[in-house]
Amino acid sequence: MTARIQMVFGLLLILLGGLIYLSFRPTTLLLFHALDRMGLMLLITDWRAWMSAYHPTEFVLYSLPGGLWAAAYILIILSLTGRTPLTQRVAIASMIPLAGIASELLQWGGLLPGIFDATDLLCYTLPLLFLIIYVIIKNFRIWQVFSTASVVSN
């Protein structure tokens, strides 16, 4: 995947997570106060009225945006750090998902305010897991190993 495609997908994931927030989350969130100060609440109110026919699940409302944003961060960092050594790229790209995982685990242990949610933990973990699998497949040419093994065994 090229850096440009990674960036585009990353920006689309940010947009999708943002649209979920704008469409369905309570307007008491800090985001809406900022949008109100920018004079955008009339537009947002109209958008929310149009979207009111839809009733997404709690997973979509509360867990999915974090996972989308974690995945977006990974993709954008990978696109911006193309000439950086692989270990540094992975370390930087892992920061946000690891922070999300840590915050959920600390909530579970009662060491951080908030409510532990296993689906939030899953949504932060999956993008990181996909990153690791992607790096293994791309950089260690694992598919070549499998195809070579199948040719040798025949």
Q: Which residues make up each language-model segment?
A:
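Bulky hydrophobic segments
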Residues: 1-154
